């Protein structure tokens, strides 16, 4: 693990060099590994701890304030977060920050910025490493239970998100930040050159989604690690878990005012931060229309900013599984069911369109329907046999229901399985498989963000044309997968689909990226592809300064050729 902060700091500040043209030597290294995903088998200690945490949350509502300037603040605009699978259970009571409070948060953040930016990276890294250790150990059951109850995740989906991925973000970002300090320019005597990785000048607005607790922690945490101050607007439907992450960071040693925790109405928050002259960045995950609107607001206000704001955004996708006739059928079926229906299809990377060759369709269809009948949808807190639970809220339920009604009425579409909806207790939608005769049907093109898988069956001899179709059908470019045992086909698909997916999988499902292994993100309408989880992501949140110090005075202003 990491050296103690004083020792690491000394190591970072003592980069020896000898001779012309040699780079500074990085004398310290932080070794980290991906957090193991726990199994939660019957009788295991992690399962017992989680069940106790779930029991403690049953019927309970937590009061969550805005936290501005190290002060807990309540406004009159009270909101509630309900459990998706039991909307009669209010899991959190919180309030929206008004414009005045948001401006106060900006002022408090700016007042803390210089001191935080000057803090050695080793000290900042230690805070996030401690938070990761807390999440890995004593706070694991709490964050999992709050993610399950508040966001409707099953135990494994909560585990790979709120525990493993969030822990990995904190640890790997710390590793990358420490190593970045060692990336220095060459020095040629009589001069010494160095780079200082400063935070951005101003504040960063972090706007996080409901579907991953880890994303919220990273959107706010990564800029803070790099010396920035942050206004964090968490999702209304992930408030319970987001506040737990914030509290853990504070308990791990994050000073007050570095991250302001400000639930707020989305448009008001966007208007307020983009009208501030001190905005220096927006770190966003959410919908394409919202990100475009924020981008336009920044452009309209460009003349007032002290610096050009950095915009990083991840906006979803219409992700594909392309199947060649040489594919392994069981791999296709299992991977597609997981990708399309885990967490109710509410992952940015979820498979939403499946392209199958005619020769394999009878076999794949039969296996999909057979396995579909075994999928259990229910209460993940009471029944650990649940594969996925309710969708996040009434708005999402209504949108998905509208798509299912479209599937029933369109002459080009046939519902093969599922598609029933029931919001009497929770926002439940059955996993639905739809076959489309038209590859350009809207259900094959537009993001649904629910448990709906659309299938197009193509002629075997048209696989190259179908690859072109996959590439051109949607405006997105987030994730995709190709299933084939033919290396030539894989090579062809990789070329044709080069820009169709920022995360491209061969004989594997389109979901499940792991920090440090598959940095995540896509281009086109899917976002700015800054690849959180990778070593380059933190560069978005630093403004490097290069310093040259000359050790031999310049004795004469004139040049030799002038003599």
From Swiss-Prot:
Modified residues (N6-succinyllysine): 31, 93, 99, 114, 130, 175, 347, 395, 509
Keyword Mitochondrion: yes
Annotated Pfam families: Aldedh
PANTHER family: 1-PYRROLINE-5-CARBOXYLATE DEHYDROGENASE FAMILY MEMBER, DELTA-1-PYRROLINE-5-CARBOXYLATE DEHYDROGENASE, MITOCHONDRIAL
Sites bearing Phosphoserine, chain numbering: 44
Classification via SUPFAM superfamilies: ALDH-like
Reported effect, residue 352 to A: Reduced affinity for NAD. No effect on enzyme activity
GO biological process assignments: 4-hydroxyproline catabolic process; proline catabolic process; proline catabolic process to glutamate; proline metabolic process
Post-translational modification N6-acetyllysine, affected residues: 52, 93, 99, 114, 130, 175, 318, 365, 376, 462, 509, 531, 552
Family named by the database record: Belongs to the aldehyde dehydrogenase family.
Pathway: Amino-acid degradation; L-proline degradation into L-glutamate; L-glutamate from L-proline: step 2/2
Residues annotated as binding NAD(+): 208, 233, 286-290, 447
Subcellular location: Mitochondrion matrix
Quaternary structure (record): Homodimer.
List of catalytic residues: 314, 348
Primary localisation category: mitochondrion
E.C. designation(s): 1.2.1.88
Function: Irreversible conversion of delta-1-pyrroline-5-carboxylate (P5C), derived either from proline or ornithine, to glutamate. This is a necessary step in the pathway interconnecting the urea and tricarboxylic acid cycles. The preferred substrate is glutamic gamma-semialdehyde, other substrates include succinic, glutaric and adipic semialdehydes.
Class in the EC hierarchy, top level: oxidoreductase
Gene: ALDH4A1
Disease with which this protein is associated in UniProt: Hyperprolinemia 2: An inborn error of proline metabolism resulting in elevated plasma levels of proline and delta-1-pyrroline-5-carboxylate (P5C). The condition is considered to be benign, but affected individuals can exhibit neurological manifestations that vary in severity. Clinical signs include seizures, intellectual deficit and mild developmental delay.
InterPro entries: Ald_DH/histidinol_DH, Ald_DH_C, Ald_DH_CS_CYS, Ald_DH_CS_GLU, Ald_DH_N, Aldehyde_DH_dom, P5CDH/ALDH4A1
Protein name: Delta-1-pyrroline-5-carboxylate dehydrogenase, mitochondrial
Keywords from the UniProt entry: Acetylation, Disease variant, Mitochondrion, NAD, Oxidoreductase, Phosphoprotein, Proline metabolism, Transit peptide
Record: residues binding substrate: 513
Lineage: Eukaryota, Metazoa, Chordata, Craniata, Vertebrata
GO MF: 1-pyrroline-5-carboxylate dehydrogenase activity; aldehyde dehydrogenase (NAD+) activity; electron transfer activity; identical protein binding
């Amino acid at each position: 693990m990491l050296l103690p902060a004083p020792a690491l700091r000394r190591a970072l500040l003592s980069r020896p060099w000898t001779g012309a043209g040699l780079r500074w030597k990085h004398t310290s290294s932080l070794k980290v590994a991906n957090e193991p995903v726990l199994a939660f088998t019957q009788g295991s200690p992690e399962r017992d701890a989680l069940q106790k945490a779930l029991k403690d949350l049953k019927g309970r509502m937590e009061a969550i304030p805005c936290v501005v300037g190290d002060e807990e603040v309540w406004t009159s605009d009270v909101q509630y977060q309900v459990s998706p699978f039991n909307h009669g259970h209010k899991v959190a009571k919180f309030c929206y920050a008004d414009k005045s409070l948001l401006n106060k948060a900006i002022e408090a953040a700016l007042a803390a910025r210089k001191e935080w930016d000057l803090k050695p990276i080793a000290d900042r890294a230690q805070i996030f490493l401690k938070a990761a250790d807390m999440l890995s150990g004593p706070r694991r059951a709490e964050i999992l239970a709050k993610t399950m109850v508040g966001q409707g995740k099953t135990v494994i989906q909560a585990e790979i998100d709120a525990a493993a991925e969030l822990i990995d973000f904190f640890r790997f970002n710390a590793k990358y930040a420490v190593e970045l300090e060692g990336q220095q320019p060459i020095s040629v005597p009589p001069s010494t050159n160095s780079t200082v990785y400063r935070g951005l000048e101003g504040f960063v607005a972090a706007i996080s989604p409901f579907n991953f607790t880890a994303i919220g922690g990273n959107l706010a945490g990564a800029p803070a690690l790099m010396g920035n101050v942050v206004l964090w607007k968490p999702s209304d439907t992930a408030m319970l878990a987001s506040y737990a992450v914030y509290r853990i960071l504070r308990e791990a040693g994050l000073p007050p005012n570095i991250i302001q925790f400000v639930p707020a109405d989305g448009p008001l928050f966007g208007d307020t931060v983009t009208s501030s002259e001190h905005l220096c960045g927006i770190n966003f995950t959410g919908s394409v229309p919202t990100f475009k609107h924020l981008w336009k607001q920044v452009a309209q206000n460009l003349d007032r900013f002290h610096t050009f704001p950095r915009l990083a955004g991840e906006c979803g996708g219409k992700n594909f599984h392309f199947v060649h006739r040489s594919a392994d059928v069981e791999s296709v079926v299992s991977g597609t069911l997981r990708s399309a229906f885990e967490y109710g299809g509410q992952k940015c990377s979820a498979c939403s369109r499946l392209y199958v060759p005619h020769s394999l369709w009878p076999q794949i269809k039969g296996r999909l329907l057979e396995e579909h009948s075994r999928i259990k949808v229910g209460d993940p807190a009471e029944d650990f046999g649940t594969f996925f639970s309710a969708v996040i809220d009434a708005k999402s339920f209504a949108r998905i229901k509208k798509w299912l009604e479209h599937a029933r009425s369109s002459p080009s579409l046939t519902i093969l399985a599922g598609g029933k909806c029931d919001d009497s207790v929770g926002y439940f939608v059955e996993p639905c498989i739809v076959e489309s005769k038209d590859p350009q049907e809207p259900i094959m093109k537009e993001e649904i963000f629910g448990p709906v898988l659309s299938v197009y069956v193509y002629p075997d001899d048209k696989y190259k044309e179908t690859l072109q179709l996959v590439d051109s059908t949607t405006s997105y470019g987030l994730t995709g997968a190709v299933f084939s045992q033919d290396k030539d086909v894989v090579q062809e698909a990789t070329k044709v689909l080069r820009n169709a997916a920022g995360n491209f999988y061969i004989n594997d499902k389109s979901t499940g990226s792991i920090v440090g292994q598959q940095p995540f993100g896509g281009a086109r309408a899917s976002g700015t592809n800054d690849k959180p989880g990778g070593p380059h992501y933190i560069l978005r949140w630093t403004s490097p300064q290069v310093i040259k110090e000359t050790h031999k005075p310049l004795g004469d202003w004139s040049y030799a050729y002038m003599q």
